[in-house]
């Protein structure tokens, strides 16, 4: 039985195994508090996220189960990875992941980025999205604050399919709305991986300009700002809007022509503007894919088709439509945690068997 240590962080009890020391608050993550800590087993710094009251409602239990399944399944250099998971005596769940020093939001608010950093960051975002999309996973909430970066400029995407709780400590917190694809904003019938490409385009534009591209005050204002730059959506896109109220609103907007992005991004080179033009397209079907973006000339300095892997298998979403009681989600969660530790233990045993005797 693991030994647990208690600490008070922001008035919240953190119960962690004795494997971890030196807890420091980092902020609020998706429905949980995040601390940095020292992993005494590996001597690495890690991030520990406490999922608060994961079994209080079926919705929370399902959301926690989904995050656990995603963290277990997604294994890629540009995606945050799980290094440990445990349930405390108080039945809170703790996810342990690698710790990166900062995020793109903090970088963008501190100083302008040079071209080679913009290219390298965008390359890594697209490399991560190629893998994630190949697994049948859509991020849905891509924004600078959930793109983590370390001192070597290695980049990892975090918080998949989850809404991040606003951190009260973070001044000038950027709204998710700025990066949201029009098909989500206007509740079109169906959306898919293309929403992440739109968000990545907004992030790319912000790296180029140093400020958000579409800083809407609300959804109506947001859509209006988008049409000022990209013009009125084409009729075949407008006709896919299911809600009559939304349809009426879009049709009431003045007709606008798409503005050439080179007029707005005067300091960016032509290949950057060309890639951005292909990402910020109203029709999701005509938006560039992550795989295509990796082959674009703007990312040529980093593109290596032999080192841009796809997922070995699709993520199993079969649980996502399930409407189950808390106790069932709890049993399923315990099973996943046991499976994770069994796989980790067998991997370590195999590694030990491979090590030749001294």
UniProtKB/Swiss-Prot annotation:
It catalyses: L-seryl-[protein] + ATP = O-phospho-L-seryl-[protein] + ADP + H(+); L-threonyl-[protein] + ATP = O-phospho-L-threonyl-[protein] + ADP + H(+). The modification Phosphothreonine is found at residue 171. ATP binds at residues 26-34, 49. The keyword ATP-binding applies. GO terms for molecular function: ATP binding; MAP kinase activity; protein serine kinase activity; protein serine/threonine kinase activity. A motif (TXY) lies at residues 171-173. It is found in: Cytoplasm; Nucleus. It holds the Pfam family Pkinase. InterPro entries: Kinase-like_dom_sf, MAP_kinase, MAP_kinase_CS, MAPK_p38-like, MAPK_Sty1/Hog1, Prot_kinase_dom, Protein_kinase_ATP_BS, Ser/Thr_kinase_AS. Gene3D superfamilies: Phosphorylase Kinase, domain 1, Transferase(Phosphotransferase) domain 1. Its EC number is 2.7.11.24. Proline-directed serine/threonine-protein kinase involved in a signal transduction pathway that is activated by changes in the osmolarity of the extracellular environment. Controls osmotic regulation of transcription of target genes. Involved in ion flux-mediated turgor regulation. Keywords: Activator, ATP-binding, Cytoplasm, Kinase, Nucleotide-binding, Nucleus, Phosphoprotein, Serine/threonine-protein kinase, Transcription, Transcription regulation, Transferase. It is an enzyme of class 2 (transferase). This is Mitogen-activated protein kinase hog-1. Coiled coil: none annotated. Belongs to the protein kinase superfamily. Ser/Thr protein kinase family. MAP kinase subfamily. HOG1 sub-subfamily. One of its GO terms (cellular component) is cytoplasm. SMART domains: S_TKc. The modification Phosphotyrosine is found at residue 173.
């Amino acid at each position: 039985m693991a030994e647990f240590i208690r600490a008070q962080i922001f008035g919240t009890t953190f119960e962690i195994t004795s494997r971890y020391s030196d807890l420091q608050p980092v902020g609020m993550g998706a429905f949980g508090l995040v601390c940095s800590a020292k992993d005494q087993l590996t001597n690495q710094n890690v991030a520990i996220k406490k999922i608060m009251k994961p079994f209080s409602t079926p919705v929370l239990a399902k959301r926690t189960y989904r995050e656990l399944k995603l963290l277990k399944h997604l294994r890629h250099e540009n995606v945050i990875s799980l290094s440990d998971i445990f349930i405390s005596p108080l039945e809170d769940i703790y996810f342990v992941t690698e710790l990166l020093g900062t995020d793109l939001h903090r970088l963008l608010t501190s100083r302008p980025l040079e071209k080679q950093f913009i290219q390298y960051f965008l390359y890594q975002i697209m490399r991560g999205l190629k893998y994630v999309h190949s697994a049948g996973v859509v991020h849905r909430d891509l924004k600078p604050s959930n793109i983590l970066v370390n001192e070597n400029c290695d980049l990892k995407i975090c918080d998949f399919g989850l809404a991040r709780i606003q951190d009260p400590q973070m001044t000038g917190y950027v709204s998710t709305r700025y990066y949201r694809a029009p098909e989500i904003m206007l509740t079109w019938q169906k959306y898919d991986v293309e929403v992440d490409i739109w968000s990545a385009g907004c992030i790319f534009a912000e790296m180029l300009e140093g400020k958000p591209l579409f800083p809407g005050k609300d959804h109506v204002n947001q859509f209006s700002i988008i049409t000022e730059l990209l013009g009125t959506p084409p009729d075949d896109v407008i006709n896919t809007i299911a809600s009559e109220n939304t349809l009426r609103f879009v049709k009431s907007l003045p007709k606008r022509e798409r503005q050439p992005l080179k007029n707005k991004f005067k300091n960016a080179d032509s290949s950057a503007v060309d890639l951005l033009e292909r990402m910020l397209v109203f029709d999701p079907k005509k938006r560039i894919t992550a795989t295509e973006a990796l082959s674009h000339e703007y990312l040529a300095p980093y593109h290596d088709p032999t080192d841009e892997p796809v997922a070995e298998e699709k993520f199993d979403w079969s649980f996502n439509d399930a409407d189950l009681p808390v106790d069932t989600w709890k049993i399923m969660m315990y099973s996943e945690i046991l499976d994770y530790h069994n796989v980790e233990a067998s991997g370590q045993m195999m590694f030990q068997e491979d090590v030749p005797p001294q």
